[in-house]
Amino acid sequence: MKHLIEMVESHKQGAENGIYAVCSAHPLVLEAAIRFARTHNAALLIEATSNQVDQFGGYTGMTPADFCGFVHQLADSLNFPRSMLILGGDHLGPNRWQHLTADDAMENAQTLIKSYVAAGFKKIHLDCSMSCEDDPIPLTDEIVATRAARLAKIAEETSDACFGESDLVYIIGTEVPVPGGAHETLSELVVTTPDAARATLEAHRHAFEQQGLSAIWPRIIGLVVQPGVEFDHTNVIDYQPEKAAALRAMVEGYDTLVFEAHSTDYQTPQALRQLVKDHFAILKVGPALTFALREALFSLAAVEEELLPMKAGSGLRHVLENVMLDRPEYWQSHYHGDGNARRLARGYSYSDRVRYYWPDSQIDDAFERLVRNLADDPIPLPLVSQYLPLQYSKVREGALKATPRELIIDHIQDILRQYHDACQRVTPHNA
């Protein structure tokens, strides 16, 4: 995958560049990302997680082939070249099947890898760090690496069979806490130590050798570590460069490797830029994008309440709350406290568990009605100013249309812009 290989090469030569990965399956988030990349003539990395998309459909109901077709169709409709689009698979391994024995879970994981690679995903995060039903807790580096190497071999064989060659790139390692934001309130995080990072790398290098995969080591371009960034429901732990100084120095000894940082959502623009400069050159973002989507929709719902009688309105927020109460499985183990605290978390938490509910047919119907209601007539500018002030200035300058979809897209793109800016290359001093 030349875009990613070239990005790493440039970074290692001192360009201080990077790439961000859009981790979302929401159509409006993906449209915002594709349009932003098209405007800036930039490659776009879109990733699906093993929770979202798997051979059984995941929580989105999509297989890897479905997701690939969905993204390609969207890109085609927006005149974005497929050659500039990179699809990645995140946390691919036994994650979804930890309740099964290791043998059964890994059998599913092998099928998962085959389905991702055959569908055309080129960036593969091998993550076998989780313990299965009959495993010790925690797993040793050797067990994790041996399982990852088995999956890498499957990936290479699948790519050769489907495409006649393999240009896959791989990410190894994992972060703590779990993907998608911490479950509990956080105060401080332990940054991965250089020794732990080296141990992960060397265990994987040895396991890959055992599988006859030494030749693909240069295509292992990223190691997931914990740089000390995370968010919980109401707080963000900001990047502190001095705590990751030893990690930064350690990765400089590897010619083809950068770090991949997960849970970078809600970091400041300055922190994002510093992460990239410190060799966390792949930045993952997901909940912050659907959080921005939710912000825009709540703002538009407030505009609708001002403009329309209640009977004619979409009732989006009411519908959303009712569905979340009727189907609490995506939030009840994450949000704690009294009734009011949980209500606030359902709507406003940084972990954005509401993102799991947007595909629901009742909520989608309310969303479509909201957009229709506000698309018939121009939204009065004072209401845009009141509820979407960041977009208001662009509307006044003539750079943005005050239509519901455009306001939503632009609000999401405000977050994407921070990541784009953080990943821009500079001219190396020795160039």
Curated annotation (Swiss-Prot):
InterPro entries: Aldolase_TIM, GatZ/KbaZ-like, GatZ_KbaZ_carbometab, TagBP_ald_KbaZ. It holds the Pfam family GatZ_KbaZ-like. Pathway: Carbohydrate metabolism; D-tagatose 6-phosphate degradation; D-glyceraldehyde 3-phosphate and glycerone phosphate from D-tagatose 6-phosphate: step 2/2. One of its GO terms (cellular component) is plasma membrane. GO terms for biological process: carbohydrate metabolic process; D-tagatose 6-phosphate catabolic process; phosphoenolpyruvate-dependent sugar phosphotransferase system. Belongs to the GatZ/KbaZ family. KbaZ subfamily. Forms a complex with KbaY. Component of the tagatose-1,6-bisphosphate aldolase KbaYZ that is required for full activity and stability of the Y subunit. Could have a chaperone-like function for the proper and stable folding of KbaY. When expressed alone, KbaZ does not show any aldolase activity. This is D-tagatose-1,6-bisphosphate aldolase subunit KbaZ.
